Structures are given as structure tokens and as C-alpha cells.
Regions:
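N-terminal basic/disordered segments at the start of proteins
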Residues: 1-33
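Metallocofactor- and cofactor-centric catalytic cores in central/energy metabolism, strongly enriched
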Residues: 3, 7-14, 50-58, 228, ...
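Ferredoxin-like iron-sulfur electron-transfer modules
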Residues: 12, 177-235, 241-251
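N-terminal glycine-rich anion-binding loops that anchor highly charged ligand groups
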Residues: 34-45
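Histidine-anchored nucleotide/phosphate-binding helix
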Residues: 55-72
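Residues at the starts of beta-strands that form the adenosine-phosphate
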Residues: 74-77
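An acidic, phosphate/nucleotide-engaging active-site surface
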Residues: 85-165
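Single conserved hydrophobic/aromatic residue that forms the stacking wall/gate
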Residues: 248-260
Length: 260
């Protein structure tokens, strides 16, 4: 049986209801009020955005959700896990600073931020995945697992490997610790089309693990032993010389060994 999907557009034909009030009504209509949150820790999982990036949900939406949680006696907190790649969210201190710069403060959202996998991204819980095909034991940020109630507050976006990312990515990849993310990316390691590479070294500058190397001809190659499959190099290559093996050979029957 298909699930009911509730939708609200951005139109506000009446001054009596703004967009935040509309979101609150949408959530209550969908059954939010039936969830027992009294005295419970409620994780609101979202993406705080990299510094300089505008493609994230505004803090106003987080406040609407947090206020509803508190109205039902819950203790909300915003959360996300650290990233594999270079940027403003690789450790908890930088991650929280990035969130504050982008407006996610306790005063604007009505609740605090907890980076789920800790200071260095290694505070995790191993969660068995029954019937897991690629990952049989997922490494999840501890604060996510410690929460009593979990809410996914997701923005829709394009993705270099998957085409687009939404709620499943926000939870599946976003709740993974740094090691958990590495395992999920493991089958998607990139390679360089030598004839397209111009030796600009953009890939080397963005890589946090020193995977790109350059030969006498100044052409890049990827050291797969060092590569974690985060795909940041794909995004920065100006000539699209770096491509993902899992996308090029997606129709081939070979699959990576499951990670236990």
C-alpha cells in the first residue's frame, strides 16, 4: 500500500498564514502530533551548508520544526555528521562554526546543534544492516543513535554520482560517521581520462587524502589505495577528465565485496 504524501506549495494567498505556519499545519496534518515526544531527545537531521553556499534550508524552517517538538514536550537538537572532504564541516568545531555563519544559532532556531559523530568524526555506533548487500554493519553517528525520535529535514539537490539527493541521502549518507561515509563511497572511486587532463592540479588541491598524483607529463592519476571515493575531484575538474568507475560501468555485473 502506497504511503500518503502531504504537499504544501509556497503560495500564501492570505495574510493570516505565512510559510512557517503553513509548514506547521502540514506537519500536524501528516500526523506529527501523534508522535510521543514528551521528555524525549529529538534529533532534527539536516545539512547546514558549506560557508559561501546558499543551497540549504533556511534556519526558519528548522525553528518551525523545533518549536513543534517543544510544544509536545520534546527536547530538540539539530544534527549532522562530519564530512570526508576538505571544507567547513570536516570536524565538529569547524562544522558548528559553519552552521553559525549560515544562521543556525540557538537564537534563530530555538535549539542547539550537536555534531553526531563527535569532534573528529569517529564517535560512532556500529548498526547491523539485516540483508545488507553492500554494507552489513553501518557506522552511524552516536548522537543520532542516542536520540529517542528522529526527524529528517531535507533539501533536494543535484548529485555528481546519484543524479539527485534527497531524504534517503540525508539519512543514509548524512548519518554516517566519517568511516561510515568512506565505506559507502568505497565502490565509486574515480579515474582520470588522460587525454582530457590539462594538469591544472585542481583535484590535488581539493583532495584531503593526497590521492591524485602527477607523472612527468603532468597528467593526473588517482591512487585508489588513498582515495575514499568522496567525489570532490569530479566536481572541481574544469575539463570533466575525472569520472566515476561505478557510473561508467554501472551495467556490468561485477559488484564490490560487502563490508562487514
Amino acid at each position: 500500500m502506497a504511503s500518503k504524501v502531504y504537499f504544501a506549495d509556497f503560495r500564501c494567498p492570505s495574510w493570516r498564514e505565512n510559510l512557517q505556519q503553513k509548514l506547521a499545519r502540514l506537519m500536524m496534518t501528516a500526523g506529527f502530533g501523534d508522535i510521543d515526544m514528551d521528555g524525549k531527545y529529538v534529533a532534527i537531521k539536516m545539512h547546514f551548508g558549506e560557508p559561501g553556499n546558499m543551497a540549504y534550508l533556511r534556519p526558519n524552517w528548522a525553528k518551525t520544526v523545533a518549536d513543534l517538538v517543544k510544544s509536545q514536550g520534546g527536547k530538540p537538537f539539530l544534527t549532522d555528521c562530519n564530512t570526508l572532504y576538505i571544507g567547513g564541516r570536516k570536524n565538529a568545531l569547524d562544522h558548528m562554526e559553519s552552521a553559525y555563519v549560515n544562521g543556525f544559532t540557538p537564537y534563530s532556531t530555538g535549539c542547539h546543534i550537536i555534531i553526531a559523530d563527535g569532534l573528529k568524526g569517529n564517535d560512532e555506533v556500529a548498526v547491523p544492516v539485516e540483508g545488507g548487500e553492500y554494507v552489513r554493519e553501518a557506522k552511524i553517528g552516536r548522537a543520532v543513535m542516542d536520540a529517542d525520535v528522529f526527524i529528517s529535514l531535507t533539501h533536494f539537490k543535484g548529485h555528481e554520482q546519484a543524479g539527485f539527493g534527497g531524504c534517503l541521502k540525508n539519512i543514509g549518507m548524512g548519518c554516517g560517521s566519517r568511516a561510515g561515509k568512506m565505506e559507502q563511497h568505497n565502490s565509486g572511486k574515480p579515474f582520470v581520462k588522460q587525454k582530457l587532463c590539462v594538469g591544472c592540479h585542481a583535484c590535488a588541491k581539493i583532495c584531503a587524502h593526497g590521492a591524485p598524483t602527477f607523472g612527468p607529463d603532468n597528467k593526473a592519476t588517482i591512487n585508489t589505495d588513498k582515495c575514499v571515493g568522496c567525489a570532490r575531484c569530479l566536481a572541481v575538474c574544469p575539463k570533466d577528465a575525472i569520472q566515476c568507475l561505478s557510473l561508467i560501468h554501472i551495467s556490468e555485473p561485477t559488484r564490490p565485496e560487502p563490508i562487514s
